[in-house]
């Protein structure tokens, strides 16, 4: 549950995280039924008095590219899934189009792989700026803001006025961890768009706050320059042979292989290692599943990550299960792999094939 006072933070973060100014031609590709589509597709642009582009059709690469030039889009807010679909089409697909009016591009919904940041610089002459927030926070908390140096793979630094930390929880107490340490990503409460409750779930709401911190459920680390790096959801971590592995790290390495378009990674039980890493991948055009390609992708992953972290198994899929916001549903992959109940699938937008 959120309150109308949240509009204050939508106005502030729209201006300082997305560079929205009066008259800016702005396109947020998120569906208005998703929190990004509400907060930054409707409220933030309205209160910042921008010109909004609204496109209700499904993703179409040529229409998207053409719209940027035709409508003279200046600020573009999209999602990693769409960016990966653009990458899949190749640099050549963008060549006929004009992106000269673009001055700022941002991404949200799930972590943006480093490869996507590098690719966007080649195609658009500037990087997509990743940022991080949740439905619970109501607005952007950590961002690669305009004018900041972008570190590919990092979600940036806390917004002005937001106190973020990497913490370790011990019962009812919390201690902050130093730079380079993986822990719970936590925030000091108090910003206007913060949730006020989970509807009819008071116990769940209270559990989210410990010792003066909101515990996000995401694991991350902070580097020596104050940039935050996403590691994974606490319940997605894979424990194998004494290593604690975040799926995002493995997925990012996999999509650096020229054949791989998208990847979803899970841990499956193993008598010796505890868990082993299994990857589900979709392929770019011009590549077909084969044993030779699987070996090549596994070899690439071992070089990038080391044998302890690289996937032991790779499964080819045409599509991966995703939510409406474009997040790959790893828990669904794992439930199906292990024959477990699938749980709530109300947010499932596209299933695996």
Describe these PLM feature segments.
Residues 157-161, 172-207, 245, 340-341:
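Conserved ATP/PPi-binding loop(s) of AMP-dependent carboxylate-activating enzymes
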Residues 101, 161, 259-262, 307, ...:
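Glycine-centered tight turns that cap/initiate beta-strands
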Residues 129-136, 155-158, 266-269, 315:
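Beta-strand->loop->alpha-helix junctions that form or flank phosphate-binding loops
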């Amino acid at each position: 549950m959120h309150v109308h006072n949240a509009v204050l933070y939508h106005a502030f973060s729209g201006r300082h995280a997305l560079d929205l100014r009066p008259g800016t031609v702005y396109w947020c590709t998120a569906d208005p039924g998703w929190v990004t589509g509400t907060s930054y597709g409707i409220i933030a642009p309205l209160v910042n008095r921008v010109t909004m582009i609204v496109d209700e059709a499904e993703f179409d690469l040529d229409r998207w590219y053409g719209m940027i030039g035709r409508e003279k889009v200046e600020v573009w807010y999209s999602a990693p899934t769409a960016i990966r679909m653009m990458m899949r089409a190749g640099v050549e697909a963008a060549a006929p189009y004009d992106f000269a009016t673009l001055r700022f591009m941002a991404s949200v919904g799930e972590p943006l792989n480093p490869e996507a940041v590098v690719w966007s610089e080649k195609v658009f002459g500037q990087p997509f700026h990743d940022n991080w927030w949740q439905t619970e926070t109501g607005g952007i908390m950590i961002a690669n803001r305009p004018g900041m140096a972008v570190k590919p793979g990092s979600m940036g630094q806390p917004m002005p006025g937001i106190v973020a930390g990497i913490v370790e929880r011990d019962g009812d107490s919390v201690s902050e961890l130093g730079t380079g340490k993986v822990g719970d990503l936590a925030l000091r409460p108090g910003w206007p768009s913060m949730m006020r409750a989970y509807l009819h779930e008071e116990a769940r709401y209270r559990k989210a706050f410990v010792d003066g911190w909101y515990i996000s459920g995401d694991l991350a680390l902070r580097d020596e320059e104050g940039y935050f790096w996403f590691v994974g959801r606490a319940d997605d971590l894979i424990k194998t042979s004494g290593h604690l592995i975040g799926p995002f790290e493995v997925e990012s390495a996999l999509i650096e292989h020229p054949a791989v378009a998208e990847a979803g990674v899970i841990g499956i039980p193993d008598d010796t290692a505890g868990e082993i890493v299994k990857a589900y991948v979709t392929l770019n055009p011009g590549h077909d599943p084969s044993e030779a390609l699987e070996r090549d992708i596994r070899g690439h992953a071992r070089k990038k990550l080391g044998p302890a972290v690289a996937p032991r198994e790779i499964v080819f899929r045409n599509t991966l299960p995703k939510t409406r916001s474009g997040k790959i549903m790893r828990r669904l992959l794992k439930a199906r792999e292990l024959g477990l109940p699938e749980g709530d699938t109300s947010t499932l937008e596209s299933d695996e094939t």
